[in-house]
């Protein structure tokens, strides 16, 4: 498949916390959709090795959720570092989208971009500077059409691939119910 500048890159990161100055990325996943939000490619889902010290510094919420999902065990067992995760992800993306073409797509992608900028700059640079943030649409719908909110429920698994799939489904829902296009 030839790279298409109209395709969209969807990304989700799982981190040890919310502060890029002290927390680290522990999982990354990407999907590519066409401009109609049809999934056309799934990138690698990568648990990124971090030290026991980094994992032990996680707060209770992260320990609980990432422990219950099995992510902490996957991170400990992983042999993949951040640079390798970046290289694998970019190798996937190059098949579908030229560098600099796609906005960063997902939920609360401003947070993901902060971590990419700090630890995975080459991957952050692969995206256009714009964001397609589903959470922005959600905030608008919550205020302007609150009854519409009841029609879409997220699982909130805090697993990168499932979170991206839900973000795409959520935008498809808003497109059909709010934008009607």
Swiss-Prot record:
Domain (Exonuclease): residue spans on this chain: 8-171
Species of provenance: Shewanella sp. (strain MR-4)
One annotated GO molecular function: 3'-5'-RNA exonuclease activity
Protein name: Oligoribonuclease
InterPro entries for this protein: Exonuclease_RNaseT/DNA_pol3 (IPR013520), Oligoribonuclease (IPR022894), RNaseH-like_sf (IPR012337), RNaseH_sf (IPR036397)
Keywords assigned by UniProt, alphabetized: Cytoplasm, Exonuclease, Hydrolase, Nuclease
GO cellular component: cytoplasm
Enzyme Commission numbers on file: 3.1.15.-
């Amino acid at each position: 498949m030839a790279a298409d500048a109209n395709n969209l890159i969807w990304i989700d990161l799982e981190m040890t916390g919310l502060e890029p100055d002290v927390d680290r990325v522990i999982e990354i996943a990407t999907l590519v959709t066409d401009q109609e939000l049809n999934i056309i490619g799934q990138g690698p889902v990568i648990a990124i090795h971090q030290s026991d010290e980094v994992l032990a510094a996680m707060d209770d919420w992260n320990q609980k959720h990432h422990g219950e999902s099995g992510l902490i065990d996957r991170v400990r067992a992983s042999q993949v570092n951040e640079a390798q995760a970046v290289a694998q992800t970019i190798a996937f993306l190059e098949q579908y989208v030229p560098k600099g073409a796609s906005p960063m797509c997902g939920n609360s992608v401003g947070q993901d971009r902060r971590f990419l900028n700090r630890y995975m700059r080459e991957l952050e640079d692969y995206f256009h500077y714009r964001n397609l943030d589903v959470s922005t649409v959600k905030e608008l719908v919550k205020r302007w059409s609150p009854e519409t909110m009841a029609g879409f429920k997220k699982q909130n698994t805090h697993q990168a691939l499932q979170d991206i799939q839900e973000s795409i489904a959520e935008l498809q829902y808003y497109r059909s119910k709010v934008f009607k296009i």
